[in-house]
Each structure stands twice: as C-alpha cells, then as structure tokens.
Curated annotation (Swiss-Prot):
It comes from Pseudomonas putida (strain ATCC 47054 / DSM 6125 / CFBP 8728 / NCIMB 11950 / KT2440). This is Aspartyl/glutamyl-tRNA(Asn/Gln) amidotransferase subunit C. NCBIfam families: gatC. Heterotrimer of A, B and C subunits. Belongs to the GatC family. Transmembrane segments: none annotated. The lineage of its organism: Bacteria, Pseudomonadati, Pseudomonadota, Gammaproteobacteria, Pseudomonadales.
C-alpha cells in the first residue's frame, strides 16, 4: 500500500502537524518506505513460531521483599512546620 500526497496531508492534519509543500515529498517517501518494511515483515510465514517477549530466557534475580528501614514518621513530622493526625499540612495553592 503506497500513500499518496493527499493521504500524507490528511495524516498531517489529523496529527496537527504543519508540513509545508517542500516537506511533503520527503515525508511521503519516508512513510512509504516504512510501510514497505511493514509489508515485508507481514509477508514472513510465522506459523509454528512461538511469540517472544524477550529473545533470551532471562530472569531477574529479585531480592526478598523485606522491610529494611524502620518507621521514622514521628521524627520526620517533628521537624515539619505543621502536621495534624499524622498528615503534613501545606498552604492552599488552588482556590
């Protein structure tokens, strides 16, 4: 499927892109080459090939989900300018 100039103008309008007349031929050629590559990829027979999320069988070594820091909320709120019921009070910024 090849794009025409009017197709690229419509796509540019929908995408809110301001293309001038000098850019349209270059953009049209670039989009047509991208669509040509997509056509090549779609032509490949992939029956029997399992989809991959990653080309290698890799797994992440995750650390155990353990609490490593103590709760210091009281110490942090002691130095805060204003708190109430465990919450930080800040000036109103939106009316």
């Amino acid at each position: 499927m090849a794009l025409e100039r009017c197709d690229v103008e419509k796509i540019a309008h929908l995408a809110r892109l301001g293309l001038n007349d000098g850019e349209l031929p270059r953009i049209t050629d670039a989009l047509n080459s991208i669509l040509g590559l997509v056509d090549q990829m779609q032509a490949v027979d992939t029956t029997g090939i399992e989809p991959l999320a990653h080309p290698l069988e890799a797994s992440q070594r995750l650390r155990p989900d353990q609490v490593t820091e103590s709760n210091q909320r009281d110490a942090y709120q002691a130095i805060a300018p204003s708190t109430e019921s465990g919450l930080y009070l800040v000036p109103k910024v939106i009316e």
